[in-house]
Curated annotation (Swiss-Prot):
Segment forming the signal sequence: 1-21
Organism placement in taxonomy: Eukaryota, Metazoa, Ecdysozoa, Arthropoda, Chelicerata
Keywords: Allergen, Cytoplasmic vesicle, Disulfide bond, Endoplasmic reticulum, IgE-binding protein, Secreted, Signal
Disulfide bonds: 47-66, 76-89
Organism: Dermatophagoides pteronyssinus
Primary site of residence: secreted
Protein name: Major mite allergen Der p 23
Subunit and partners: Monomer.
Pfam families the UniProt entry points to: CBM_14
Length: 90
């Protein structure tokens, strides 16, 4: 009985290791997909700080959320505009 349990654990360890090894191939190109709400403009927005909410300088109905220096372009709902002082659409 003890021998059977050891065999099961060894088999499981080999199976888990081989599945991780199969996914760890540096020769395969990888693609990372980042969801966005709207397309980035040609002149990409640069976050002025690591985290925060910032007005779109070209459109008062849009704004950017910066997280770890990455900008995500967002639309204000309805006919609202980005309010820089309140950091929300009003």
């Amino acid at each position: 009985m003890k021998f059977n349990i050891i065999i099961v654990f060894i088999s499981l360890a080999i199976l888990v290791h081989s599945s991780y090894a199969a996914n760890d191939n540096d020769d395969d190109p990888t693609t990372t997909v980042h969801p966005t709400t709207t397309e980035q403009p040609d002149d990409k927005f640069e976050c002025p700080s690591r985290f925060g909410y910032f007005a779109d300088p070209k459109d008062p109905h849009k704004f950017y959320i910066c997280s770890n220096w990455e900008a995500v372009h967002k639309d204000c709902p309805g006919n609202t505009r980005w309010n820089e002082d309140e950091e929300t659409c009003t």
